């Protein structure tokens, strides 16, 4: 939690830490699994008068490490945080997700999936943003739209608005009536979601 306000250096530092341990311990590229920082309202611990840093940037940096470091994986904990408690009570969720990573990536157990979808690219068609993911072949298509404060889109003005989203195969489609020409989309871009 101490790095929540230094996301801009986190991916490089964490990558060096893992590679340093591997070099020091001379065990090769041993599996390295870690937990995403759980959502929390960092405004609670921010000094009065200071800007509240958005920990979504740290979660993004943590996700990048998984793609930089061979034989690593991140257990996503977006649904396991506590708004007013920096140490979430849902420890079993974290343990189970780490175990799934080990089962699939280290031991090659088939029929279980420990990896979460990872952003690949976006395509914009008219008023809709189509988001493609890696590791998303397990999704079920659904035509039902759902609105959520967790999905937001912005136009050229970079003002984000809540959006509707739906799934088609391994893609997430996102749009907002307030943004006729979207250029960006974001998901769970708050400290606590």
Regions found by a protein language model. Name each.
Residues 1-193:
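Cell-envelope and extracellular/periplasmic
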